[in-house]
Amino acid sequence: MEYHQPEDPAPGKAGTAEAVIPENHEVLAGPDEHPQDTDARDADGEAREREPADQALLPSQCGDNLESPLPEASSAPPGPTLGTLPEVETIRACSMPQELPQSPRTRQPEPDFYCVKWIPWKGEQTPIITQSTNGPCPLLAIMNILFLQWKVKLPPQKEVITSDELMAHLGNCLLSIKPQEKSEGLQLNFQQNVDDAMTVLPKLATGLDVNVRFTGVSDFEYTPECSVFDLLGIPLYHGWLVDPQSPEAVRAVGKLSYNQLVERIITCKHSSDTNLVTEGLIAEQFLETTAAQLTYHGLCELTAAAKEGELSVFFRNNHFSTMTKHKSHLYLLVTDQGFLQEEQVVWESLHNVDGDSCFCDSDFHLSHSLGKGPGAEGGSGSPETQLQVDQDYLIALSLQQQQPRGPLGLTDLELAQQLQQEEYQQQQAAQPVRMRTRVLSLQGRGATSGRPAGERRQRPKHESDCILL
C-alpha cells in the first residue's frame, strides 16, 4: 500500500495530461518536484492547441474527480477512460459545426443546371428548357412559354442555364408589365399582385400549391401562386371535371375543391346518416376512377376552351406542362431531357385519357424517328410514305370531330361515353341499395337472417349425402 500511494497521483495526472495533450506528457514527465509548474504548463499547452476555454476545463474537472477514488482503486485504468470520454465528446462537438457549413456548398450545383434545346419555331431558332427527374416543372412551363413567345431570348450558343438565371428573366418580365388601366384603385391592386408574384417566385423552383375545382377547366381555388399566371397572361387549365350526365357524382362533388372534397369524404364516412355515407362513398369512387386527373368530359371541355394557337399551362398529376392548340388539336411540349438530341420530337399529342399519344416535330408533323411503342417506324422510310402517314394521321383526327351526329346530336365517341356513363350510373345506383340492405341485414340478424341462412345450409347437406352414397 505504501508503494501504491505515492504512485497513484502521478498516473492520475498523467492520465489527464494524456487525455488532453499526449505530447505535453512527454515533456512534463521529467520535473516531478514542482507539480504546480506542470499544471501551469498543461494549461498553457491546452490553451494553445484548443482555443475554447470550456474544453480545457472539462479534462481538469475529470482529473479532480479522479483524485477521490484513487485511494480505493489499486490501478488507474478507470481514470484514463473517464478522462478520454469528455475529450471524444468535445472533439465531436467541434467537428460537427465544421461539417454543417460545408453541406450547402455541396448541394448548390445539384439542382441548378438545366439543358437548353434549340428548335425551329415559326422560322426562328428558339430555345426551350428541358428537365430531368423531379425538375421545377412550374418554372420551366412558364419560361418555355415566354421563350416561345420571344419575350425572353438567350444567346445562340447557350446550352446550359441555371435556375437563378431563369428566375432573373422571369422577374424582369414581371417588373416590365405595366397596368392597362390608369385609375388609382386598379394601379394599387396591380402593384399588390406584382408584390405577391415576386414573393411566390422562389416556390416556382420547388412546386406550387394548386387546388383544382371540378366544375370547369379553368376553375382553381385562388392562391397567391395564381397571380403569376394572371400577370403574365398565361392561361392555366386542367381537365379533371365531373361529367354532368352523372347527377349523383355532381351532387356529391358539387363546387368543392379537391382539398374540400377530401375533407368532406372523411366527415361523411364517419357520419351516422346513411345518405351522407352514400355521398361520401360516391365522391371517393369518383376520385378513384379519375385518378389520372383527366376525364373525357374534361378533355372535350378543354379542347373547346383553348384558343387556336394559344400557349397555356396544363396541370395534371401534379405536373405542369406547356400546352398549345393547333388545328383544333391539343399538344404538350416535350421537355424530358431524354429527348434533348431528338430534333424531331418537340410536341406530344393530347387526344386520349389513357395516355396513348404521338410525337410530333416543331411543325406538328408526325415524328417517324422515334416512337413510344416497339412497332414505331424508323427514319429510313421514303418521304412519300412519311407524307402518307402524316395525312392518314390528320385525317383520322379530323374524322373524330367531323363524325355524323346521331338523333341526339352526339358523335360516336360521345355516344360511347354516354353508354359507358349510363353503365357507371347503374353501378352507382346499385351500390347504395346493396349498402342499405347490408346495414338492414346487420341490424336485423336475430330473426330474419336465420331462415335464408338455414336454407342455404340444408342444400350442401343433401349434396354431401349424395356424395357419400
UniProtKB/Swiss-Prot annotation:
PANTHER family: NF-E2 INDUCIBLE PROTEIN, UBIQUITIN CARBOXYL-TERMINAL HYDROLASE MINDY-1. This is Ubiquitin carboxyl-terminal hydrolase MINDY-1. The gene is MINDY1. GO terms for molecular function: cysteine-type carboxypeptidase activity; cysteine-type deubiquitinase activity; K48-linked deubiquitinase activity; K48-linked polyubiquitin modification-dependent protein binding. It comes from Homo sapiens (Human). Disulfide bonds: none annotated. GO terms for cellular component: nuclear body; nucleoplasm. Changing residue 424 to A/D/E: Decreased binding to 'Lys-48' tetraubiquitin chains. Changing residue 416 to S: No effect on binding to 'Lys-48' tetraubiquitin chains.
